[in-house]
Amino acid sequence: MPAQTRIIHYYVCLGAAGGKEWKVNMNENFEYKIATREDIDAIVQFLARDYYETSRALKDPCKMIFLAYSGEVIVGILELLDLSNISFVYVSEDYQDTLVQEELLELAERFVTKELTAYTDEEHLSFFKQHDYVVDVESNSRYLLKKTIPVLPRFSDYDQVLEFIEAQKDRVYSLTNFKNFMYDFYDPQTKLTCVHIGGTNGKGSTTNYTKEVLKCAGYKVGTFTSPALVNRLDIIRVDDEPIDETTVVRYANRYMDDWMAYELSKFEIEVFIAVMYFIEQGVDIALFEVGLGGTLDATNIVSPILSVNTNIGLDHVKFLGNTYASIARSKAGIIKRGIPYMTAERRPECLEVFYEEAHKHHSYVIEIRKPKRVYYGASISYDYHGYHIDLSTSAHYQVANSALAINILEYIRKEFPFKDADLEKGIHDAVWEGRFETIHQNPLIIVDGAHNREGMDAFFESARDFSNIKIIFSALGDKDTHHMLETLLSLSKDITVTQFDHPRRATAQQLAEDFPVKIDEDWKHAVEEAYSHKGVVFITGSLYFISKVRQYILSK
């Protein structure tokens, strides 16, 4: 048999389950769902005995299992391996003459972007042939069957897809369309084991620390983070490798009509692609970073084993409110029924909101404490929960982020075991681009994505350890730039404000108003001038801004 058949583990069969008898209404409607771990007992009962090894199959990240229900009774099951291979089909004998078999096959085909295969015998060959499967390989009365899924080639390259996605409207006031889309798509996100990480600052760093430890322990980890620092593909990664352009084109050609029908936003499309890609790649765990707020964020369709809040800051006040309590309520929107909510936030008004929302959802809050003894220098070290932690950064704010990651890891350790050495090595090895990152020596140039009041305050704590400082600053117009510049002026009087191409940018003139700073509307010119500085150059104010600067400097 050819190499592609090696992953077909189960004999594809259509037959009775343990001799049970069912009264069948030939006109009845059937309901379908993607199986979760809560369905284990029902599946075992349906199959009469657990020769299917249900528990292990449901935990296998490469397998997606579909169930057919008649009322509250399972009558059919189909397993899809790697989103490309039908590896198990089982339908109750009394439902052989209904549409269950056909509808299970059609359901599987919705999740396939190119080609679907199955491996069967002579007895069931005709069934698959009736549904346009063709024999690819025959060996010892066993058949490898293939069916090509018809897809219109609307996009020929990634640039076309990116242009299409960018053209979709942003929507932050409602999640209804996306929830309906995912529901009608049988909620594939429920297949993923994931952690949902929100908060104002530190989400990306916390995600990165968590990912690195899990990777050290041998797990395959999917991460969804935003915004992208270098390339838009970077927001979706598996073990640090971004999704490739060809895969995005494949998904776009397959699902564009569905995206358009439900009027999905750019971010919603990207979340859907991430979900499908993580399933296809068979990740052991997925880490989803909230984009904006929580309640109405597109990532809020996931079903996490843990929800996390890094902290609360006054950011995106136009959408989330202008008080800590109102922002906390939006962030707490990711709390799920029965799922704990972990937070490093200490403000009483925020914690009050968290406890209130957790109570509504029959959940509970896990408050974490920061390390007490921290040793600062060119790198940072501390002892925490029995671990000795060495950070490969001088950014003070990474103490809180790494400590939160340690608490996340300890919470999920029962399901994802790791050694203490894995944690210490992973935390040390973790490097997060754009967060107090040195990108040039002589002069020393450090970029930092501080982009709001609290982020700039945290940046200040690390930057004040330096002397002879020059700063290049730019920001979006909806940020508290007045506070950020006041903070930066306490570090240095040598500040150049500039501007970059972004629809929400603040102009250099707007930033400079009321402040004794230099103005240079050409950010590249400002960077070139900074090369003659004899001390340290900090470039900060916006993740979007430093992504451009970072790429420019590193490409030289």
Question: Model segments located where?
Answer:
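Conserved acetyl-CoA-binding loop-helix of GNAT-fold acetyltransferases
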Residues: 97-110
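Conserved GNAT acetyl-CoA-binding A-motif
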Residues: 111-123
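Conserved active-site alpha-helix within GNAT-family acetyltransferase domains
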Residues: 122-142
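Short functional linear segments
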Residues: 150-199, 206-208, 212-217, 224
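ATP-dependent carboxylate-amine ligase catalytic core
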Residues: 172-175, 179-191, 216-302, 320, ...
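Extended acidic/charged loop-beta regions that coordinate divalent cations
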Residues: 270-319, 351-388
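Nucleotide phosphate-binding/pyrophosphate-handling subdomain across enzymes
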Residues: 280, 285-288, 298-308, 312-316, ...
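C-terminal helical cap/extension that packs against the catalytic core
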Residues: 347-362, 376-379, 444-445, 453, ...
